UniProtKB/Swiss-Prot annotation:
PROSITE patterns registered for this protein in UniProt: RIBOSOMAL_L3
Subunit structure: Part of the 50S ribosomal subunit. Forms a cluster with proteins L14 and L19.
GO MF annotations, alphabetized: rRNA binding; structural constituent of ribosome
GO CC annotation terms, alphabetical: cytosolic large ribosomal subunit
Record keywords: Methylation, Ribonucleoprotein, Ribosomal protein, RNA-binding, rRNA-binding
Record-stated family: Belongs to the universal ribosomal protein uL3 family.
Naturally occurring in which organism (per UniProt): Hydrogenovibrio crunogenus (strain DSM 25203 / XCL-2)
Entry's Gene Ontology BP terms: translation
Record protein name field: Large ribosomal subunit protein uL3
The encoding gene: rplC
Maturation and modification: Methylated by PrmB.
Length: 212
């Protein structure tokens, strides 16, 4: 995997091309990602680059975190993220304290975006797994949205792991692959990505160059 950026999902809008065709896009604000550490195989067992972005109130920063940020010479951020490196040449010219901006995506056409999906709470099978509903009438009284059978008989005598049933929906990490990068707005530090991205407005997303 290569170096990406950490950003904030702003919301959705649309842009028009020269022919007047509308394209729905999600706006991601990418404040400069500050490098806090560059890891290598000799000292850490793997090659990676560690970054932070945004800011955090001084009272919320623990002493170990404060020391880590001070060693890198950067302001304390909202958290720490790592990008593992397959090619160590990507970090040439970079060092702790350097910044990664949206300019990194000037020559990128397709990206992968990771985020945490919206939480939906406890949901039934119809909403959570798109189960078909049972008959609305004709003798059906209380099982309109019931899932039906969840297993077999005395053999195997249990419910298989992973059986689709009612339960907690959403609030999981999800990556959407191969999204078109419509525009890179360097002046305003924005990425305009075609389509929807996982997560709510204001949530943190990770944008990388597409891997396949």
């Amino acid at each position: 995997m290569g170096i990406g950026v950490i950003g904030t999902k702003v919301g959705m809008t649309r842009v028009f091309n020269e022919d007047g065709v509308s394209t729905p896009v999600t706006v991601v604000e990418v404040s400069p990602n500050r490098i806090t550490q560059i890891k290598n195989n000799e000292t850490d067992g793997y090659d990676a680059i560690q970054v932070t972005f945004g800011s955090k109130h001084a009272g919320r920063v623990s002493k170990p975190e404060a020391g880590h940020y001070a060693k890198a010479g950067v302001e304390a951020g909202q958290g720490l993220w790592e990008f593992r490196l397959d090619d160590v040449s990507e970090v040439e010219g970079l060092e702790p304290g350097s910044e990664i901006t949206v300019e990194k995506f000037n020559d990128v056409a397709v990206v992968d975006v990771s985020g945490t999906t919206k939480g939906k709470g406890f949901q039934g099978g119809v909403k959570r797994h798109n189960f078909k509903m049972q008959d609305a009438t004709h003798g059906n009284s209380v099982s309109h949205r019931a899932p039906g059978s969840i297993g077999q008989n005395q053999t195997p005598g249990r419910v298989f792991k992973g059986k689709k049933m009612a339960g907690h929906m959403g609030n999981v990490k999800q990556t959407t692959l191969n999204l078109e990068l419509v525009k890179v707005d360097v002046e305003n530090s924005l990425l305009l990505i075609k389509g929807a991205l996982p997560g709510a407005k204001g949530s943190t997303v990770i944008v990388r160059k597409a891997i396949k």
